[in-house]
Amino acid sequence: MGSGGKVEYRKLEAFQKKLQKNLTGTEMNSFIESCAKELAARLLAKVIKRTPVGQYPTSSGKKGGTLRRGWTGGKSGGSAYAQSLKVNHYGDVYVIEIVNPVEYASYVEYGHRTRNHEGWVEGKFMMTISEGEVRRNAPKILENKLKKKLGECFKL
């Protein structure tokens, strides 16, 4: 037969209190929101990189990059912009809406007919492809964040 071991109940109770404090109520809600914002920041980083920039001759006076700048509303960093986005909470679902307000964004994303209606310009699918990549990587990203959060609870 095995022998009994020693258990320090004070440390166990302290761990229980710390776990309850860190994983309930508003603390849990803010953790989930930070996870959503991190995923949004990663999505923005990928979609901004994939968004094409128009090339114009210098003499035209046009400047390319309007569509790319549209992802952040003209603000400089995608990560900083993602942190400023509002997280909507519907039941047990957290939603961040990422929109490019540039009027021709959907045409570049999905493709469109040519001006003379005799051809088709293929879409770039910058959002669709980026969303798929983030969706595939999300479990690992969230697992790492959860491990880090639980690690904070184990530090007594």
What are the residue ranges of the model-derived segments?
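Short, Lys/Arg-rich flexible segments
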Residues: M1-L156
